[in-house]
Structure formats: C-alpha cells, structure tokens
Swiss-Prot record:
Recorded superkingdom: Bacteria
The protein's enzyme class: ligase
SUPFAM superfamilies: Nicotinate/Quinolinate PRTase C-terminal domain-like (SSF51690), Nicotinate/Quinolinate PRTase N-terminal domain-like (SSF54675)
Family: Belongs to the NAPRTase family.
PANTHER family from the UniProt entry: NICOTINATE PHOSPHORIBOSYLTRANSFERASE
Organism field: Pectobacterium carotovorum subsp. carotovorum (strain PC1)
Modified residues (Phosphohistidine): H221
GO MF entries: nicotinate phosphoribosyltransferase activity
Organism lineage: Bacteria, Pseudomonadati, Pseudomonadota, Gammaproteobacteria, Enterobacterales
Gene3D superfamilies cross-referenced by the UniProt entry: nicotinate phosphoribosyltransferase
Entry-linked InterPro entries: N/Namide_PRibTrfase, NAPRTase_N, Nic_PRibTrfase, Nic_PRibTrfase-Fam, Nicotinate_pribotase-like_C
Name of the protein in its database record: Nicotinate phosphoribosyltransferase
The reaction(s) this protein catalyses: nicotinate + 5-phospho-alpha-D-ribose 1-diphosphate + ATP + H2O = nicotinate beta-D-ribonucleotide + ADP + phosphate + diphosphate
Example of a GO biological process term: NAD biosynthetic process via the salvage pathway
C-alpha cells in the first residue's frame, strides 16, 4: 500500500467551529479537567490497515499553529476573549496523546490528556481518517465528480421545491469530519456559495475565514458528557452544562444540543429560564418530526412563541430530507439545516465512512451518550449507564454499543 506522506491538514482552523467555542469555555472553567476519547466505526469496516498512515498524519499535525491572519480573524468575532486567543496562539497538537493501533484489522484510537487540548483532536482526526481511506479506496475520484453530483442534487432540489416559498430556507455546511477530502469540501462550499442562495454558513472555521462565510456551531455531546462527572450531582449535570454555557456565552452561540441523555430528559431540564435564554435547539438523533413536535409543544407550554426560536436539524440530512422538514415545520418555527456527509462525500461509487470520536471518560470516570437513537449510544460502563438512566428517570432500552 502506497504511503501518502504530505500533510492532509494545512490549518489549525480546519475544524468545526464548535470545537473552538467549547475549548474556550473549557479553558476558562475546566482548565485542569482530564478526559479520554475513543474512535468508533459504526459499520463493520476494518480500517486497521490504515493505522500507520493515519499515525503519520497525526505526527504531522504537531506543526499546525494559528498564523497572524487567523489570529486577527478570530479576534474580530464577538465571542472570543483575548486571554483564550493568546493561549490558542501557542497551542500545538501533541501526538503523544493519541494511541493508534491495528487491532486484528480493527482501527483502535484512544486520545487522553487535558480536556482543553484533547478537545481539538476529534474533527481534524476524523477528516484525516476519512481522506486517508478514500485516497486508497477511490484514488481516481476528483472534486469535479463531486461537483457534478452536487449540480444534480441542486437541480433536483429546485424541481421538488418549485411550489414552496424558500425565503426562510437556511442551509449550513457541516461536512468537515466525514468529507471525501479537504479539496472536495472547499469545492462544494464554494459552489454552494455561488449557486445556492440559501447557504448561510459553514462549521469549518478555515473555510469561513477564506471564503468570507459565517462560521456556525455551538456545543457538542462532549460538553454535556463531561458534566456527568464534573457536576457534584449526576441528576443535575445537564442543567449544570446548560448553565455554564450561558455563563461563558450569555448573548451568543445559543443553540442547545438535546440528545446527550434523550430529548425527553433534556426537556425536563430545559425550563423557562433556559428556554428564554437559549436561541433554540439542535436535533442530532431520533425521528426528526417527533423531535420537532416535542420542541414546539414545549415552547408553547412555556408560553414562548416558537417563531421566536430556531430549530437546527443536523442528523444524517440531505437536501430532500431538509425540504420535507421545511414543508412540515416552516410556518411554525424558524429552521436551519446542517448537512454534512451528503454534501462533502456525496460521490457516485463512494461509500462514506460512518465514524465518530466520542468522550468515554472524564477525570478517570465513565461518561455516556445515550441519544435518541440506540445505535448512537456510547458508553463502556453498563453500571454507569444504569446510574444515568436512574438519575434521569429513563426507561430501559437496548444495550449500549
């Protein structure tokens, strides 16, 4: 197997925006917290054969740093503080935090260290894994082929939406982590910027800066997971996470992720003060229509006009699914659609990887993501899952994977 030695990543900002948003909050409030995260391939693919090449790319990541233009760009945004940005300027990836093994054909990756540092590994490392695998599996695929497929998808969208008022349709690129390649993502986002007036942003800070697009993203599951061990009381951990986020970002980045414990448990914690303070909610697992109906009903019970709030859908979307949700909810609540893999790895003959890196420990103790989709549940410690379900008064479900 040919080893590609040139670096895949060229910028520290080639990551999802919410990683920097969370990192700043961790830097300010949880500087000494340690965590562990692990790689999961949700399919049955054996990716261990690529371990050496992935490890080489991880080693090259130690040379990435914030340059002057990037520092100036981040400084222009209203929610970053000078102390964090000066610290970030000195940040370097430490490859010794990452263990990569070919375990009988299975790819094993474990990342350990201070949360403020470990937090930045997930997205660029997933992008590296995806690009390494696709380089070998589809060596002749070009960005032009991705562009042809995008053109067909946009034409289909235009035909299917001809009878719909799209003035409030909003699309965000969420495609960094499982992209076919860095080049393909840039090609796709550039094309959308030129040809699709409903694109409002990208989660990728590097592309946002270079293409002058709005960067988008708030927090991920790990923010809520870590609080399961940071909070003195497990049953209060989700509220603690929501409250600390508001402490760091009282007037920005106000979309809350709902499915770390399940939507029902989230809504029990999401009382009137939180519902008023947060701009809206993000869906990432479970039936999107059921979820949206629950969200709207919750706002109505609290006497909050749903049209004053925003629902962000980001779970395995494509343009057709987004359009169906827009038809269903568009007159009742503000909507934004985050599409990832179906934009940046939507190429005929190419099978996208279903890969994640998730937090598994905080301060040496287990954390869990239960989700609204059993297949997305992550925890190694079944006793802790039982504790979590009891603390949040959840019914028994399928065994965690």
């Amino acid at each position: 197997m040919t080893l590609h030695t040139s670096p895949i990543l060229h910028s520290l900002l080639d990551t999802d925006a919410y990683k920097l948003h969370m990192q700043q909050a961790v830097y300010h409030h949880y500087y000494d917290v340690d965590v562990a995260a692990e790689f999961r391939c949700r399919g049955d693919e054996l990716l261990g054969v690529y371990a050496d090449e992935i490890a080489h790319q991880v080693d090259l990541m130690r040379f990435l740093s914030l340059n002057d233009d990037e520092f100036t760009y981040l400084s222009s945004l209203p929610f970053f503080k000078p102390d964090y940005l000066h610290w970030l300027r000195g940040f370097r990836f430490n490859p010794q935090q990452v263990s990569i093994k070919n375990n009988a054909g299975k790819l094993d990756i474990r990342i350990t260290g201070p949360w403020r540092e470990v937090i930045l590994w997930e997205v660029p490392l997933l992008a590296v894994i995806s690009e390494v695998v696709h380089r070998h599996r589809s060596p002749n695929v070009t960005a032009e082929q991705a562009l042809v497929q995008l053109s067909a998808s946009l034409e289909s969208f235009r035909q299917h939406s001809a009878d719909v008022d799209l003035s409030q349709f909003k699309l965000m690129d969420f495609g960094t982590r499982r992209r076919f390649s860095r080049d393909v993502q840039q090609t796709i986002v550039t094309a959308l910027q030129a040809d699709f007036p409903y694109l409002i942003g990208t989660s990728n800070y590097d592309l946002a800066r270079r293409l002058d697009i709005t960067p988008v993203g708030t927090q991920a599951h790990e923010w809520f997971q870590a609080h399961q061990q940071i909070s003195p009381t497990l049953a209060n951990s989700q509220r603690a996470a929501l409250q600390m986020w508001l402490r760091e970002y009282p007037s920005h980045l106000g979309i809350a992720l709902t499915d770390c414990i399940t939507m029902d448990a989230f809504l029990r914690d999401f009382d009137l003060p939180f519902a008023e303070a947060y701009q809206g909610l993000r869906h990432d697992s479970g039936d999107p229509v059921d979820w949206g109906e629950k969200a709207i009903a919750h706002y109505q019970r609290l006497n909050i006009d749903p049209m004053s709030k925003t629902l962000v859908f980001s779970d395995n979307l494509n343009l057709d699914k987004a359009l169906a949700l827009y038809r269903h909810f568009g007159q009742r609540v503000n909507l934004v659609f985050g599409i990832g893999t179906r934009l940046t790895c939507d190429i005929p003959g190419v099978k996208p990887l279903n890969i994640v890196i998730k937090l598994v420990e905080c301060n040496g103790k287990p954390v869990a993501k239960l989700s609204d989709s059993p297949g997305k549940t992550i925890c190694q410690d079944q006793n802790f899952v039982c504790e979590l379900r009891k603390a949040f008064d959840l019914p028994r479900v399928k065994k965690a994977s």
